[in-house]
UniProtKB/Swiss-Prot annotation:
This is Probable malate:quinone oxidoreductase. Its EC number is 1.1.5.4. It comes from the Bacteria. SUPFAM superfamilies: FAD/NAD(P)-binding domain. One of its GO terms (biological process) is tricarboxylic acid cycle. Keywords: FAD, Flavoprotein, Oxidoreductase, Tricarboxylic acid cycle. NCBIfam families: mal_quin_oxido (TIGR01320), PRK05257.1-1 (NF003603), PRK05257.1-4 (NF003605), PRK05257.2-1 (NF003606), PRK05257.2-4 (NF003608), PRK05257.3-2 (NF003611), PRK13339.1 (NF009875). It holds the Pfam family Mqo.
Length: 548
């Protein structure tokens, strides 16, 4: 019966798309140089780059909802962290000999510096306005308890001091000092408990929805940019001249139109995979997706909010995905401070918060079903974790909160359902399929269409991700003197690494902090800490990571 239902659904969708395409042929075809599918931060960032690089190019953006930045980019649907590995312990895994690997942390931090430079440049151009409306200084902290975890944090701190990007980090195992940094975390805690924390003053809270709205608002001021809301892509067809005809349905009046584009970017968040499959390019066959949602506990009580000014990340428990680590965060949303704790994983077959329950089934094909099965079989610990999260009660979530806020009161908190994150599953020659953390740009060989898949670190690295897309799709233009000069004006550090260059790191942090109105003090000498005891780690099966 299920197979019959699925088949009938697929036939209905297919017939609807054919009908839409036929109706659209009767209407006049719109032409555009660039079609941006999705009104989120990725499309907004790419459009902003292209507006400066090729101001004469025409652009059209289509968004299925009634406004932009209403899905994953919406401030309430994500953690709002400027991910720079200052506190996220999953970016510094422990090696078998007990040492700490910082390569991933350095790469994440370098990427966020590009985002800071991109935003600062847009403020100077008047594209982004009032930096405090979208980015604010919120110290980033790591906090752990227990001898093994404290030793890990010591080793992490010592390792990160070798990088110019982490020089301003502080370290302490003193209860009084940590209480000064984060009162909520320490008040009511056992004074004999062994704890440790790091704190970096230049951490940020970012409202990606506000950035998206401001970028798109600026794009709309140009006559060769068009924004179409309540518009859903129903079909994509490659033409003989390598342009694309995209059928777009108006969800309000039921009509359809064809848009002929020289280049198509699919920046539709969780919906990107299905649209990539619809394009028919062979590269799409390597991918599948698995949706995971997230919930947060939220407090707007002034007694809580005014007592906490930090993002405090812990360490994932044994058997849990590293990215699942709980954190208690100061957020600035809708112009006011709130505190969020989470995330707690949820499950839905939707690929978007405003998606369809058929999303997972309709994206499963004969070419990706086996990789999905391999991932499920190879990651049983992850499956157990997700099941345990879905089964959490209100009391379970509150007990998790009390580990980070011992004196928390139930009446101060409410549960909030955040957005959906579609994890990448990619075909693998050895394992059949692997779960990939991070984002991936998928494009055709001709460079006429590209999609962004994945979820983490996501919005905080939109600027470097879209730079990567430009290099992949417009390689010849990127290497031209004109584009090189423009890109280096947008991102002063473009083409070189900040890590290892203290003067360059401080120069860029000082520049972006001044323009964005962020706190920045020149780093002082590193804190003296006990020497970490590097203990060989027991061999354990690695738990696949997911983004929440």
């Amino acid at each position: 019966m299920k197979k019959v239902t699925a088949m009938l659904f697929s036939m209905a969708v297919g017939l609807n798309a054919v009908s839409m395409a036929a109706k659209a042929k009767a209407s006049e075809e719109q032409e555009t140089d660039v079609l941006l599918i999705g009104g989120g931060i990725m499309s907004a960032t790419l459009g902003t780059y292209l507006r400066e690089l090729e101001p004469e190019w025409s652009m059209t953006m289509v968004e299925r909802l009634e406004g932009v930045a209403q899905e994953s980019s919406n401030g309430w649907n994500n953690a709002g962290t400027g991910h720079s590995a200052l506190m996220e312990l999953n970016y510094t895994p422990q090696n078998a000999d007990g040492s700490i690997s910082i390569e991933k942390a350095v790469a994440i931090n370098e990427a966020f510096q590009i985002s800071r430079q991109f935003w600062a440049h847009q403020v100077e151009r008047g594209v982004l306005r009032t930096p405090r409306s979208f980015i604010n200084t919120v110290p980033h902290m790591s906090f752990v308890w227990g001898e093994d975890n404290v030793n890990f944090l010591r080793a992490r701190y010592a390792a990160l001091q070798q990088s110019s990007l982490f020089r301003g980090m502080r370290y302490s195992e003193d209860h009084a000092q940590i209480k000064e940094w984060a009162p909520l975390v320490m008040e009511g805690r056992d004074p004999q408990q062994k704890v440790a924390a790091t704190r970096t003053e230049i951490g940020t809270d970012v409202n990606y929805g506000e950035i998206t709205r401001q970028l798109i608002s600026s794009l709309q001021k140009k006559s060769n940019f068009s924004l179409q809301l309540s518009s859903e892509v129903r079909a994509l067809k490659r033409n003989d001249d390598n342009t694309w005809t995209v059928t777009v349905a108006d969800l309000k009046n039921g009509t359809a139109q064809n848009i002929r584009a020289k280049f198509v970017f699919i920046g539709a968040g969780g919906a990107a995979l299905k649209l990539l499959q619809e394009s028919g390019i062979p590269e799409a066959k390597d991918y599948a997706g698995f949706p995971v949602g997230g919930q947060f506990l939220v407090s707007e009580n002034p007694d809580v909010v005014n007592h906490h000014l930090a993002k405090v990340y812990g360490k994932a428990s044994v058997g849990a995905p590293p990215m699942s680590v709980p954190h208690i965060d100061t957020r600035v949303l809708d112009g006011k401070r709130v505190v969020l704790f989470g995330p707690f994983a949820t499950f839905s077959t939707k690929f978007l918060k405003n998606g369809s329950l058929w999303d997972l089934m309709s994206s499963t094909t004969t070419s990706n079903v086996m990789p999905m099965m391999h991932v499920g079989l190879d990651n049983f610990d992850l499956v157990k974790y997700l099941v345990s999260q879905v089964m959490l009660s209100e009391e379970d979530r509150f007990e998790a909160l009390k580990e980070y806020y011992p004196q928390a009161k139930k009446e101060d908190w409410r549960l909030w359902q955040a957005g959906q994150r579609v994890q990448i599953i990619k075909r693998d020659a050895d394992k059949g399929g692997v779960l990939r953390l991070g984002t991936e740009v998928v494009s055709d060989q001709q460079g006429t269409i590209a999609a962004l898949l994945g979820a983490s670190p996501g919005a905080s690295t939109a600027a470097p991700i879209m730079l990567n897309l430009l290099e992949k799709v417009f390689g010849d233009r990127v290497s031209s003197p004109q584009w090189q000069a423009t890109l280096k004006a947008i991102v002063p550090s473009y083409g070189r690494k900040l890590n290892g260059d203290v003067a360059a790191t401080e120069r860029e942090l000082q520049y972006t902090s001044e323009v964005l109105g962020l706190k920045y003090d020149r780093p002082q000498a590193a804190d003296s800490t006990p020497k970490p005891q590097l203990k060989p780690q027991p061999v354990q099966k690695e738990v696949a990571d997911i983004a929440l």
